[in-house]
Amino acid sequence: MIETILKKFLESKLSVPVLMEQDPKSTASQFVIIEKTGGAQKNHIPSAIMTIQSYGASKYEAAALNEEVKRWMLDGLEGLITVDEVSSVNLNSDYDFTDTTTKRYRYQAVYELTHY
């Protein structure tokens, strides 16, 4: 499952919690949430659209965490592409995605992954 592969990878690289859903009991000011928002399969090779939301106590902290996530996702020598089950990592977009309901600062990056 690409979600668990991505979660384990980011946990090994980041110093903040990596979650698959928001934990209402958590008091962490910085964390990331990963979510699969789509997927396809072509010639028996699966692909996935993954979003990674980076949360911070300030807009700057959220943006800085987003940049760190992007660096680890896209690095050719130590990034996600080095994981055996992943054959392609592309950044589709990233943007300020502050949650106006909860007033929490976050950025969101959208990736297209090809995996096995």
Positions of the model-derived regions?
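Small/polar-rich, solvent-exposed N-terminal microdomains that initiate assembly or binding
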Residues: 1-42, 60, 64-67, 71, ...
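Residues in well-ordered beta-strands of folded domains
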Residues: 19, 35, 53, 92, ...
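A broad, low-specificity signal marking well-ordered, structured residues that form hydrophobic/aromatic
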Residues: 31-32, 50, 89, 109
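Short glycine/proline-enriched loop/turn "hinge" motifs that connect secondary-structure elements
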Residues: 41-45, 100-103
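Acidic-leaning, charged glycine-interspersed low-complexity segments
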Residues: 75-114
